[in-house]
A protein has these predicted regions:
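Phosphate-binding core of ATP-grasp and ATP-grasp-like enzymes
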Residues: 107-121, 152-163, 189-192
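Coil-to-beta-strand transition motifs
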Residues: 5, 78-80, 163-166, 178-181
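C-terminal helix-cap and adjacent tail motif
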Residues: 187-212
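A short glycine-rich, hydrophobically flanked beta-strand micro-motif that places a catalytic Asp/Glu
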Residues: 58-65, 160-175
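Short histidine-centered catalytic/ligand-binding loop motif
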Residues: 23-38, 120-147
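Active-site loop/lid in soluble adenylation, ligation, and acyl-transfer enzymes
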Residues: 1-115
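Conserved metal-phosphate-binding beta-hairpin within the catalytic cores
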Residues: 85, 166-186
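A long amphipathic alpha-helix within ATP-dependent nucleotide-binding catalytic cores
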Residues: 136-167
Length: 212
């Protein structure tokens, strides 16, 4: 755009495997009609709340008719970093650490980071790894972790008010020209694991409940 910002187009592609939607999958595996629109709606809803809370994001504005979002320019960390915040021991966390935890046990807004790399299965990386590899500074990591926990609480509290429980959620962060950490990408049902009365809610059902 002329003002230096970027325009993101929301598509109907989702992560999954063998034609089945799975937010934990690394590869884009299927197309669901209308999912781009609903992902944009949810992203607008949460980005506006997060911005209002004084947390930096790349969100500027959106156009639902065009399914586009105007965003501030941001660089990704390394070749892309995913940040997961977990309230419950489920999914890959449980598979890795099942010797040390019960399925579904509470976690204190546990934050972990993975490199975006489908071929390597999005490998986990520690704070020391990120700093020593020159991906980010220790201060940037501390900001990223605090922001992740604050944003996750905003999302979880909102879902709680709708009778829904957030178990975990995945974000992407980047940084601006001054090196400030900012939330980028989207906040959509496909990036979170949500339960209602102990039952997993698939993302398309969650969209329906969220915008009911």
């Amino acid at each position: 755009l002329e003002n230096g910002n970027y325009l993101l187009k929301f598509k109907d592609d989702c992560t999954g495997k063998d034609g089945v939607f799975d937010p934990g999958e690394n590869a884009v595996g299927l197309t669901i009609e209308g999912v781009g629109d609903v992902n944009l709606r949810m992203s607008i809803y949460f980005f506006e709340k997060i911005n209002a809370a004084g947390i930096k994001t790349h969100y500027v504005s959106a156009d639902l008719n065009e399914t586009t979002m105007e965003v501030l320019p941001a660089k990704v960390f390394g070749k892309g970093l995913e940040v997961i915040c977990r309230y419950k021991a489920v999914g890959s966390f449980y598979r890795r650490y099942s010797d040390y935890c019960e399925l579904g046990q509470d976690l204190p807004a546990y934050v972990e980071t993975t490199f975006k790399n489908d071929a390597l299965g999005d490998p986990l990386v520690t704070k020391d790894g990120l700093v020593d590899l020159g991906v980010m500074t220790a201060e940037q990591y501390d900001d990223l972790k605090a922001m992740t926990q604050a944003i996750t609480k905003i999302v979880a509290d909102d879902l709680k008010a709708k009778g829904l429980d957030l178990y975990d959620i995945k974000f992407e962060f980047g940084y601006d020209a001054e090196g400030n950490v900012i939330l980028i990408d989207e906040i959509a049902s496909g990036n979170m694991r949500v339960y209602k009365d102990g039952e997993y809610i698939d993302p398309m059902t969650l969209n329906g409940l969220f915008f009911a």
